[in-house]
């Protein structure tokens, strides 16, 4: 999933 990417974006 892209959950990891969502957090990395912050």
Swiss-Prot record:
Its main location: secreted. It is found in: Secreted. The keyword Secreted applies. The modification Phenylalanine amide is found at residue 10. Occurs in three forms: Rhopr-MS has unmodified Gln-1 and Met-8, Pyro-Rhopr-MS has pyroglutamate at Gln-1 and unmodified Met-8, Pyro-ox-Rhopr-MS has pyroglutamate at Gln-1 and oxidation at Met-8. One of its GO terms (cellular component) is extracellular region. The modification Pyrrolidone carboxylic acid is found at residue 1. Keywords: Amidation, Neuropeptide, Oxidation, Pyrrolidone carboxylic acid, Secreted. The keyword DNA damage does not apply. GO terms for biological process: neuropeptide signaling pathway. The modification Methionine sulfoxide is found at residue 8. Belongs to the myosuppressin family. Myoinhibiting neuropeptide. This is Myosuppressin.
């Amino acid at each position: 999933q892209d959950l990891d990417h969502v957090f990395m974006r912050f």
